[in-house]
Amino acid sequence: MKNIKKFDEFIDDQNYETMDELLNTVYTDEMLLEMANISQNTTGLDVIIWVQTNNTQSTGKHNLPRIKFQNNTAIKIQINELIPISISDNPKILLKNNDLNKIKISQAQINAVKLWIVKNKEILIDYWNEKTTTDELFQKLKK
């Protein structure tokens, strides 16, 4: 509880150029509480993976099961660098065509993420549908 700040203290700690930037940051911070990140050491991938359930309040419900991968190979979490990708036998990046040029990682790294999703599809879908806990997810994930 000691990390809770008043709104004006929060604003003073940050450097926002616009109100939209502030609102997007607050939204993103709230979203983070509802997502679990999976490190490169756990997945064997070059990128950090983010998982969430379909009961995420801040983002609304999605029809298509998805995870997100970090759009770089940094070991530091960068929440503004997340790319959604479907959980399926043939995972698809869920960006509009004109946004695909924003992808910074290599095609080989994207293919590795897709193979990892296929290998872990069952447990990822169970987590998406809230049929398993985060602890169980981490125990059952395969590299």
Can you say where each PLM-predicted feature lies in the sequence?
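Short, compact, well-ordered microdomains
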Residues: 102-143
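A short, structured beta-strand/loop element
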Residues: 45-111
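Short, charged/polar N-terminal "headpieces" of proteins
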Residues: 12-67
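Short coil/turn linker and secondary-structure boundary residues
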Residues: 2, 17, 27, 105-108
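Generic secondary-structure boundary/loop-capping signal
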Residues: 1, 82-84, 138
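Short acidic, low-complexity intrinsically disordered linear motifs used
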Residues: 1-12
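UBC/E2-like fold recognition across ubiquitin and ubiquitin-like conjugation systems
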Residues: 11-14, 141-143
